[in-house]
Amino acid sequence: VLFNVHLSAYGADAAIMAAQRATLYEDMKRERAAGNYVVAGGDYNHDMIGVSGDVYGNATDAVESWAKPYDFDGVPEGFTVASKAKLDETGIAGFSDAGTCRDAGRPYDGTNDRWVMDTFIYSDNVEPTFYETVDLDFAYSDHNPVLLKFRLK
């Protein structure tokens, strides 16, 4: 089962964001319990590695509501956040993926703040074989695409 997600970005109401995650997680857990393979990909509108500012040297000290670190502790057992797993494997110094999202508050000049906002969350019966951000230098959008290749266990 593939979920295409675009979670709420703006506003300081943490309850709305938590409710969206809870709904997604319940749907994902139900599908996994039914024996299905589960992948949820899209724009989570949170920092999906938790340290994007450090990785990309962002100039902005203030973290907007949509750029806050994701609640990784809330991810259900048996599911993995692809971007965080890659960061955990490589460490900050070894994480070389391009940002998936840039500050769109001004024209892009290569120095805009960047984050990893787009990723996949997959179930334990899905085995990733390749994961990366496709670095298009934000030519078409304020987001870069993310590619996940996987096999079903």
Predicted features along the sequence, with ranges:
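Active-site regions of metal-assisted phosphoester/phosphodiester hydrolases
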Residues: 1-153
